[in-house]
């Protein structure tokens, strides 16, 4: 698929966003070079109690605990093993209260599903959230998505809208996860700067279209609207012989390994990155 066709696909996408920046700008490599702060409209205002509490906390561990407690209170979810509440974990098998037995969608379940298969139903919901909030459509879900009127697009839409995952205000949960990540990253800016140097291992560029070659090893690639990176180059080599190295602005980070003490992405230290066009340096592992 050539660069002109790809650009057309993005231009036909939903250019409206909930972060105050047009999707064409968010999609560009230029945004990554000179990012501006992003906030999802109304989230901090609607959850003022949480962010007032966070403003009183200096310790990162206490901040994470405050966030987890707030999510448990607001959405009836928990951060313990398997995403179950303490009451459910301590109850004998089959003795969980009836009101707790039905499936309760949560951001932790989505992260766990992503860790297992980023092209599964949970991955579709996460990509759908990015599409809704940032106006960036996915370019890959199980296989390349080249046009809207296609079986590939229809399959993605069917999975992202599954009623199983859209109970319990799941996108509002993801809004809060993003805003909490931005709150934490803003407080680390003095030590990390505006960008994180991240790595992604691939075996080919089937999922990442090359838009422009800048130098022998430096290219602009179009990443899927949500992708996994890692801060550890050695970990990236587990997933492919070609290592993409990118400077990712804080504003395009949904989740990172040390954000919460309990989550399903611990093993590989994943960072969930909002996609678009990125300048990357490609080397062999």
Report the location of each language-model feature.
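Intrinsically disordered, low-complexity, charge-biased terminal/linker regions in eukaryotic proteins
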Residues: 1-102
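Acidic-enriched, low-complexity/disordered segments with a strong bias for Aspartate over Glutamate
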Residues: 2, 14, 33, 58-59, ...
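Residue-identity detector for threonine
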Residues: 16-17, 49, 69-73, 139, ...
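ADP-ribose/NAD+-binding catalytic cleft of ART/PARP-like enzymes
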Residues: 20, 77-227
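Compositionally biased, intrinsically disordered low-complexity regions
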Residues: 44, 78, 82, 203, ...
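Helix N-terminus capping/helix-initiation residues
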Residues: 58-62, 120, 249
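ADP-ribosyltransferase catalytic core
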Residues: 216-285
């Amino acid at each position: 698929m050539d660069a002109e066709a790809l650009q057309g696909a993005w231009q036909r996408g939903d250019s409206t966003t909930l972060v105050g920046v047009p999707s064409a700008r968010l999609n560009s490599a230029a945004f990554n070079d000179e990012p501006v702060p992003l906030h999802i409209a109304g989230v901090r205002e609607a959850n003022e109690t949480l962010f007032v509490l966070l403003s009183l906390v200096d310790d990162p561990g206490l901040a994470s605990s405050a966030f987890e407690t707030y999510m448990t209170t607001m959405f009836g979810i928990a951060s313990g093993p398997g995403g179950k509440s303490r009451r459910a974990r301590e109850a004998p098998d089959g003795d969980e209260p009836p009101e707790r037995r039905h499936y309760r969608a949560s951001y932790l379940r989505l992260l766990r599903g992503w860790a297992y298969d980023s092209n599964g139903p949970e991955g579709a919901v996460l990509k759908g959230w990015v599409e809704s909030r940032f106006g960036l459509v996915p370019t890959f879900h199980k296989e390349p998505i080249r046009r809207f009127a296609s079986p590939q697009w229809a399959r993605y839409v069917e999975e992202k809208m599954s009623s199983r995952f859209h109970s319990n205000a799941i996108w509002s949960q993801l809004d809060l996860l993003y805003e909490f990540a931005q709150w934490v990253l803003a407080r680390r800016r003095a030590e990390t700067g505006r960008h994180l140097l991240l790595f992604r291992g691939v075996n080919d560029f089937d999922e990442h279209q090359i838009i422009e070659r800048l130098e022998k090893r430096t290219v602009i690639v179009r990443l899927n609207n949500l992708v996994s990176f890692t801060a550890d180059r050695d970990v990236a080599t587990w997933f492919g012989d070609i290592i993409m190295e990118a400077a990712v602005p804080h504003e395009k980070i949904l989740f990172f390994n040390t954000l919460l003490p309990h989550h399903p992405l611990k093993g590989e230290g994943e960072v969930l990155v909002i996609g678009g066009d990125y300048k990357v340096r490609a080397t062999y592992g």
